Structures are given as C-alpha cells and as structure tokens.
C-alpha cells in the first residue's frame, strides 16, 4: 500500500494529535538549547535543517515554477520564518502552554474572518478573554522578560494567521510539501544575514548538531508536512477548528518535559482559548485522494 494511501485513511484529528506531540516535543527540546544558542538562532537552525531535508526529499527543481509560484512560496516562507523565530523568543520567556494558547489568537482570527455565523464571531471574544487572563498571570508573575515574551508571541500569532492563509494558497496549487520545501529554503535565506552569527556555537559540538536536527525533524518537517496534507482537505476555518486539539497537547508536553505546571487562572484562560477555537465552524472539506495525501 502506498504511503499516501495510508495517510489518506488517517482521520484529520489523529494526524493533528501526532503532529502536536511532535511539534511541542521539539519545542521542549529547543528550550534546552537556549542556554547555549540564542532562541532566534535555534529557530533559524531549525528552519535551515528542515529546508535541507525537504529539498533533498522533494527535489523541487523537477517542477516548472512560474514567477507567481516563487513569489507565493517566498511569502509563505517569510511568514513561516517570522512565526518560528518569534515563537522561540516567546518560549524563552513564557511557559510553553501559555505561549501556545496566546498564539492561537492567529488561527481564531482566521476562522472569524473566513467563516460565517455567530460561532466564528463569538470565538474572538472568548479568545480575547482567555488571552487577557493568561497575559495577566504572566505579567503578575514578575518573570524576567515576560513583556518581551508577550510581544513576541503576539508577533507569532500574526505570522501564524498569514501562514494559514498563504499555506492554503500554496497547497491548492498542488504538490504542497514540495512547495513547502521552497518556502523553507526562502525562510532560511532571508534569515541568514541576521541569524548566522547567533547560530555559530552549534558548530563546535556534535551533540548540539544532533539536538538541532532532532528539533527540526520534530518541529518542522513532520508537523508542517502533515499540515500541508490536511490543508488540502479543509479550508482556513476548518484548519483552525482542527488546531483546537493542540493547546492541551502543549500544556501536557510543557508539564511533563519542562515541569511548567499551570495555575488555575491559566487553566481557565487555556480552556477559553480552546473553546473559542472549537466554536469556529469549518467549511465543508474538499475531497481528498491518495495522491493528494501523499503530496
């Protein structure tokens, strides 16, 4: 049986749970590197390694690329790069679960804008209340860099919204994972002038190299490839609904791997954000074939 046929049989929720465990497990591994390599440098290295893996796997030079295709893939890559760098800066200052929940304002906003009805509109209000609770607890904690973390996660949320919209446009043009490889390469090239120097410490220790490769595979290659597959099945609003499965995953990974235990008020904020995402109504999924799933 072809791998694409197997993936096509896996329900979207199951794909997202596996994707979330990998992505946030990779984030927890990345946090352990921040003492040696700045967070932005780790994020760029993650993108660089993921780009190399995807380019070797998908060999995008075999496709015919129009100027529009390249511009779209580059814009997608820039959004992806900003999202990753800002998120890593945020989790250097905020608990993983809190950062992930606040970042979900991006997908909730996409659902509200692209969907229709009271569910999508009310989701924004609930998400806003949840974010206020989470941000309030963070600011009252007097944790070093809390304000920096909140600003960074706001930037990440905005970039995530752009990623969803641009990712949909990339995916529907066909061979989404191959186009993702080009987007990753564009993100690595754009970030290189600013982040190469910050990433230099990794060159002196093979254990750091191995850790960065692990972060890239867990947090970029697997999750983003899965998301490209699922984006072929659902619209932006539906994608945002499926993402409602992930905040709890981030909290569990943060608690188990990083010993970041949320307070009661934070749990309420997390719950409100999850409900906000769940309230948004997905569009009717488009048919998916085995070839689409294996793209």
Regions found by a protein language model. Give the residues of each.
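Glycine-/small-residue-enriched transmembrane alpha-helix faces in small-molecule transporters
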Residues: 1-44, 78, 82-86, 129, ...
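Transmembrane alpha-helices of multi-pass small-molecule transport proteins
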Residues: 36-82, 109-110, 159-166, 180-198, ...
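Alpha-helical transmembrane segments of compact multi-pass small-molecule transporters, enriched
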Residues: 48-53, 102-113, 186-190, 238, ...
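Transmembrane alpha-helical segments that form core, pore/gating elements
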Residues: 54, 110-111, 127, 133-134, ...
């Amino acid at each position: 049986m072809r791998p694409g046929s197997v993936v096509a049989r896996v329900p979207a929720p199951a794909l997202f749970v596996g994707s979330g465990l990998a992505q946030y497990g990779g984030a927890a591994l990345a946090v352990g590197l921040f003492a040696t390599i700045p967070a932005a440098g780790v994020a760029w290295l993650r993108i660089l390694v993921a780009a190399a893996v995807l380019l070797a796997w998908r060999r995008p030079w075999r496709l015919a690329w129009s100027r529009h295709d390249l511009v779209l893939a580059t814009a997608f890559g820039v959004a992806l790069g900003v999202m990753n760098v800002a998120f890593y800066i945020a989790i250097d200052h905020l608990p993983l679960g809190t950062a992930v929940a606040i970042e979900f304002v991006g997908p909730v906003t996409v659902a509200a804008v692209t969907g229709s009805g009271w569910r999508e509109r009310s989701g924004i209000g609930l998400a806003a209340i949840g974010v206020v609770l989470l941000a309030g607890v963070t600011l009252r904690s007097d944790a070093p860099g809390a304000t920096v973390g909140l600003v960074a996660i706001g930037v990440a949320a905005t970039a995530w919204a752009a990623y969803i919209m641009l990712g949909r446009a990339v995916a529907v043009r066909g061979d989404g994972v191959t186009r993702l490889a080009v987007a990753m390469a564009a993100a690595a090239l754009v970030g290189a002038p600013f982040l190469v120097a910050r990433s230099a410490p990794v060159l002196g220790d093979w254990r750091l190299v191995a850790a960065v490769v692990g972060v890239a595979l867990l947090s970029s290659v697997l999750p983003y490839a899965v998301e490209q597959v699922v984006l072929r099945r659902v619209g932006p609003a539906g994608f945002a609904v499926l993402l409602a499965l992930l905040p709890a995953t981030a909290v569990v990974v943060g608690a188990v791997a990083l010993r970041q235990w949320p307070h009661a008020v934070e749990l309420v904020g997390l719950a409100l954000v999850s409900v906000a995402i769940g309230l948004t109504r997905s569009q009717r999924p488009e048919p998916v074939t085995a070839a689409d799933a294996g793209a």
